[in-house]
């Protein structure tokens, strides 16, 4: 019989805390930039809790749907539903509880039913479009399915706008920044995930998941990794006018580092030399963290944006 601590640990594992950690890192800079120069720590904390429950629900639903293929992969076979430490039925109930709690939390405590709606939309897309359909049918699963992982910035932005006059009051220029943040993560996701796929290619193949590294030649994979890396870095520069030199410096330095590492991986595959794709995987995490920490600092300080400095 499992102890309470063991049961709690298993349920926590269903939410994939490491994945959520990265998602929440994206929520904070979005909220700070949306309220540039003004910091409401209480609202940010409440949003993070609501966002954690929403993301935890999506990840738990993912465990429910994928429990069969998780049993076939070394990287995932220790997940609670794969090991049956938590039954599929119990996990499904837990996911629904988290989702409902997230919606009510964001709606009533964060005063943003728009953000709550985005949480529902994200869960629907992640579970039905990505997990049940794209993931098992096409190598483009990561490209389009990755849109769900971009939603924390939209949720965070929605909370701020709903607490400052509403989404329509914010105007298109404000939401354009949110869309740019969304697209940064959208373009960042494929190189991040395909690098992992190159390392665990045999696992995905054994589970019948058509990840790009499984169905395409390595050179084609690294070529796509390179293209999406460039796209992510270039997109990050679109936010420069709405920030100061702090963000600009971080975007250029970390972006250059990201591109160089992607080029090294591609060149290694092209030359037929041994490569270490996990180096790019971990570096991609560092890139996004550096970029968003810099944006957070930039927004909190509220220094003059480069657009105002140039245009007056």
UniProtKB/Swiss-Prot annotation:
Claim: Nucleotide-binding is one of the keywords in the record: no
Enzyme class: transferase
Gene Ontology, cellular component aspect: plasma membrane
Membrane topology summary: Multi-pass membrane protein
GO biological-process terms attached to the record: heme O biosynthetic process
CDD domains linked: PT_UbiA_Cox10
Residues in the signal sequence: none
One Pfam family here: UbiA
UniProt KW Transmembrane helix keyword: yes
TM region positions: 12-32, 41-61, 93-113, 114-134, 141-161, 168-188, 240-260, 290-310
Localisation: Cell membrane
An example molecular function term from Gene Ontology annotations: protoheme IX farnesyltransferase activity
Catalytic activity: heme b + (2E,6E)-farnesyl diphosphate + H2O = Fe(II)-heme o + diphosphate
Domain of life: Bacteria
EC number(s) stated in the UniProt entry for this protein: 2.5.1.141
Pathway noted in the entry: Porphyrin-containing compound metabolism; heme O biosynthesis; heme O from protoheme: step 1/1
UniProt keyword annotations, A-Z: Cell membrane, Heme biosynthesis, Membrane, Transferase, Transmembrane, Transmembrane helix
Protein family (similarity comment): Belongs to the UbiA prenyltransferase family. Protoheme IX farnesyltransferase subfamily.
Note: Carbon 2 of the heme B porphyrin ring is defined according to the Fischer nomenclature.
Stated role: Converts heme B (protoheme IX) to heme O by substitution of the vinyl group on carbon 2 of heme B porphyrin ring with a hydroxyethyl farnesyl side group.
Designated name of the protein: Protoheme IX farnesyltransferase
Gene for this chain: ctaB
